[in-house]
Amino acid sequence: MKMRIQIFFILSLFSSISFASVQDFCVADPKGPQNPSGYSCKNPDQVTENDFAFSGLGKAGNTSNVIKAAVTPAFAPAFAGLNGLDVSLARLDLAGGGVIPLHTHPGASEVLVVIQGTICAGFISSANKVYLKTLSRGDSMVFPQGLLHFQLNSGKGPALAFVAFGSSSPGLQILPFALFANDLPSELVEATTFLSDEEVKKLKGVLGGTN
């Protein structure tokens, strides 16, 4: 019986290892099927050095929008070589007063490093405890997987930061957009958020929601 348990444990351990760790890499094939562990692998004969490089983070994003912020992601499959390696990154540009609203990454934890400006960042634990920190150039902060967190430009000029994730596809859900940028009926939003009808319709108008 003890031997069976040991064998089961070993098999479970090996089954949890990503496909990319069995081979050298698993470059994403965007034309193939996607599963919870990532994209299917590109034919190794078709893989080139370009699959392992990404040049999209050197240019500032467009912050002319309602949140005065831009996120430039380097995720799979756009950065195909990341597939299966449990790592990715993104660039954050925040104009004056810009904010990345409360959001979560269901698939990964996040580490942020400030390159320029001052950013007020924080997250809320599952016990509803708030962890808040004002970050300056060179400062870093970690945001645990799945917890609500935000970044706000609290300085006088623009702010720039880079973030890294523990997944090639960390996922993203922005709370205000999830509530007010879709067709969820206003009466349900009001009932579940304790906001008035006027407040809900105002936010839906700003973020493009209906009903």
UniProtKB/Swiss-Prot annotation:
Domain of life: Eukaryota
Record's keyword terms, sorted: Apoplast, Cell wall, Disulfide bond, Glycoprotein, Manganese, Metal-binding, Secreted, Signal
Family annotation (SUPFAM superfamilies): RmlC-like cupins
Complexes and interactors: Oligomer (believed to be a pentamer but probably hexamer).
UniProt function note: May be involved in the maturation of walls of growing cells.
Family label: Belongs to the germin family.
The protein's name: Germin-like protein 1
Organism: Sinapis alba
Encoding gene per record: GLP1
